[in-house]
């Protein structure tokens, strides 16, 4: 029977209400489907790599079958999680927008006649790195699609992924205070780290690094769940000039 370990790094011990609401609904939904769920929150760890590694360390002490990172600034539809579990992929994630407003896409949508109340649907900027990408590729929204890498903000990982990767990653002795008293001076495997990509010399974030070593060291695969509808919550500075009003474009006489 599947058992999902929800892991959330919470710097400052804070989360958004949308996240909490989704999480509580998810718990009820999984219980109704006879799927066990536990939550692990890590507070006040400023280094995200260390936070994720510590959460994995805690997960591996349990008998849970799947670990799912859900970050505290993600608003998700709980109904999207069970299909991710049933997809039976080693690593599967949802694609969420970056914390920015895609003004160019909003402008294009407005010019195309999209009603004002629907413009927010076009405000997101997404990064999707499909496998075998060639020009346009049609993706079925109800089936997993393989990708090179994805974000850990909403990612489900099977236990065997970490068990296979253990022998391929370094480890370190924990020297930080754990307020919960669960981690002493224990050895923790470094599944998440930053690294420089050899070919493009890009600095990889901890989630892209994880996906890369899973692919390179274990010939693993990473998948996206196109059906997952996610929001990425952040702060925004709201600007405006009271006296400024948009003017309609003037027609030019020929």
Q: Where do the language-model regions lie?
A:
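N-proximal low-complexity "stem/linker" segments adjacent to membrane-targeting elements
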Residues: 1-46, 50
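Conserved catalytic core of nucleotide-sugar-dependent glycosyltransferases
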Residues: 56, 77-193
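Conserved donor sugar-nucleotide recognition element shared by glycan-biosynthetic enzymes
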Residues: 48-52, 124, 207
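Active-site nucleotide-sugar/metal-binding loop of Leloir-type enzymes
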Residues: 53-66
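C-terminal catalytic/acceptor-binding lobe
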Residues: 2-5, 167-254
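Cationic, hydrophobic amphipathic alpha-helical membrane-interacting segments
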Residues: 12, 33, 38, 100, ...
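Short beta-strand-to-loop acidic/aromatic patch adjacent to the donor-nucleotide binding site
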Residues: 64-75
């Amino acid at each position: 029977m599947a058992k999902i370990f929800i892991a959330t790094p919470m710097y400052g011990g804070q989360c958004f209400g949308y996240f909490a609401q989704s999480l509580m609904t998810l718990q009820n939904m999984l219980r109704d489907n006879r799927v066990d769920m536990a939550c692990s929150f890590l507070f006040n760890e400023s280094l995200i790599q260390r936070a994720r590694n510590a959460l994995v360390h805690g997960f591996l002490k349990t008998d849970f079958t799947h670990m799912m990172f859900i970050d505290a600034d993600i608003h998700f539809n709980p109904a999207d999680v069970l299909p991710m579990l049933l997809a039976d992929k080693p690593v599967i994630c949802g694609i969420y927008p970056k914390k920015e407003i895609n003004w160019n896409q909003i402008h294009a949508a407005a010019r195309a006649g999209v009603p004002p109340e629907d413009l927010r649907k076009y405000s997101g900027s997404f990064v999707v790195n499909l496998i075998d990408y060639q020009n346009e590729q049609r993706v079925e929204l109800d089936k997993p699609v393989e990708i090179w890498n994805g974000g850990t903000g909403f990612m489900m990982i099977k236990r065997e992924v970490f068990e296979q990767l253990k022998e391929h990653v370094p480890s370190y002795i924990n020297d930080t205070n754990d307020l919960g008293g669960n981690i002493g001076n224990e050895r923790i495997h470094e599944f998440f780290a930053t690294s420089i990509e050899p070919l493009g010399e890009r600095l990889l974030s901890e989630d892209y690094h994880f996906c890369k070593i899973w692919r390179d060291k274990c010939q693993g695969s990473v998948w996206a769940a196109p059906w997952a509808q996610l929001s990425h919550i952040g702060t925004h500075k709201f600007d405006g000039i009271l006296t400024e009003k948009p003017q309609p474009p003037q027609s030019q006489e020929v």
